[in-house]
């Protein structure tokens, strides 16, 4: 596996490769990331991964400086997965001058849910993903469903810009107790780690309530999610949101949508101690 930091060297290395499968990451790799590499191999060849902690998507009070950086361990893991190239640029490589041009998602998708609680986050995500796509020029790119809103935004961005890249979704990888694997799980104390799977169990309860009451016209989805947030608060969580949305565009479902059987998803973000966790479950 070649480890490359220069954009020009990356382009030279990939010249003539027209089925590149790409997996962008911020490093501190776990089994969830490695499953993306395996899925990428099913859709293209060679597999290219990137590791870049993107300052543009971190807010002023977020964990950019503390975000775990484990490059040597990550390199060893990617080598075992047979990754062809790891693109690991420095900030100077990616942003040799201030990044004045940005890619901003539409308000209805970029400023709700995560976008409401992390202003500017998706502008940073879209900008770096677009730049990585320009550097790698993949035919396929794999994004995990754990970051459901990010997946939807990147997919729409690729469509609206007519980018020649297929966005492939990957199922969330979970620990045996249901907790979604995340690089930020390392921040959890032992007690918090024992409590953390309750977030996924709460999503299952919301799904059950939607199926048994909302779809039967006996309750609104807002009543169901309010109950879920109250439940989490009672267990010591600080939920930002629990929300039922349409899978197609992450907008709130209307009664007509629900009656017509519109596919739905429930999404959540909540703090446990100092650690903010996100998760989702399709209904």
From Swiss-Prot:
GO molecular function: ATP binding; pantoate-beta-alanine ligase activity
Residues annotated as the enzyme's active site: 33
The organism's taxonomic lineage, starting at the top: Bacteria, Pseudomonadati, Pseudomonadota, Betaproteobacteria, Burkholderiales
Subcellular localization(s) per the UniProt record: Cytoplasm
Organism expressing this protein natively: Ralstonia pickettii (strain 12J)
Family: Belongs to the pantothenate synthetase family.
Keywords: ATP-binding, Cytoplasm, Ligase, Nucleotide-binding, Pantothenate biosynthesis
Pathway it works in: Cofactor biosynthesis; (R)-pantothenate biosynthesis; (R)-pantothenate from (R)-pantoate and beta-alanine: step 1/1
InterPro entries in the record: Cyt_trans-like (IPR004821), Pantoate_ligase (IPR003721), Pantoate_ligase_C (IPR042176), Rossmann-like_a/b/a_fold (IPR014729)
Coiled coil regions in record: none
Name used for this protein in its record: Pantothenate synthetase
CDD domains: PanC
